[in-house]
Amino acid sequence: MKYDQWKMTRRIEEDFLKSLNFLSTLFEKIAIISGNDVKAFQNKMQTFQNSVPYDNYINDIVKRMVTPLAARNYETWRKAARVSTRSHFLYTVLMEELKQGIKKDIDSQIISNAALIKTLPSDTAQKVVRDIEEYALSGLRVEEIEKLIQDKTRQHSRASARLIARTEVSKTTSALTKARSEELGLRWYVWRTMEDGDRVRKSHRIMNDVLVSWNNPPSPELLVKEKDVGRYHAGNIWNCRCYSEPLIDIDDVKWPHKVYINGSIQKMSKARFSLLI
């Protein structure tokens, strides 16, 4: 059974991007007041990164991203469990276990996401400085340095904001689903793509509708003979909107079904798969 509500909502990603772009605007203002002084720009960005208001802001925007994701994830679990679970008793137990794990999961994701965003000012500054050093070899006038600092700050900060918003919303969703699956003893999920046509990577397209064990993340790139970028679960790599659909009941999928096992995708019967769970 394919339950579409596991699919990630774009609204949370868009709201998170707006919050990150506000930081980009502040970085651009720091670049303007720094003029052509690269060292002053670096120092100001580092000072901003170490400030209490910055800490408060990133914790706030991360909380506003993680909390609705966790709420949606819980609601999706509740509905999927009701559809998949034939026993009312089992459904009740499932819901109780989910409730107990929610706060811990939310707190964990807030901490990890805030840590990632924390270094955004210094990371942006370092990229700008590297660009300035490269351009300096060709000889730059003072006014060109000033404009370059501003342009590169905008370019790098906006690009980072887009990457973080897309990647971290997806990774947070994946982490929440994985944590709750493990709490409930559910070891398998179905890898789903967002079905964006040509926008889906070839390596991810081959993983669509494949059963994957949480204990054995695949290396999709190796399956299509591309450069290996490591082993990871659905939605757990940069610029990926794939998502995991937990296998709550073995009859939630049609058999025989594709299964990732021993580094390859195999068509497997229900009886054979039953030996793995």
Description of each model-found segment:
Residues Q155, A159-Y260:
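Acidic, glycine-rich two-metal-ion catalytic cores of nucleic acid-processing enzymes
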Residues M1-H156, L247-I277:
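N-terminal leader/targeting and assembly helices and adjacent pre-domain segments
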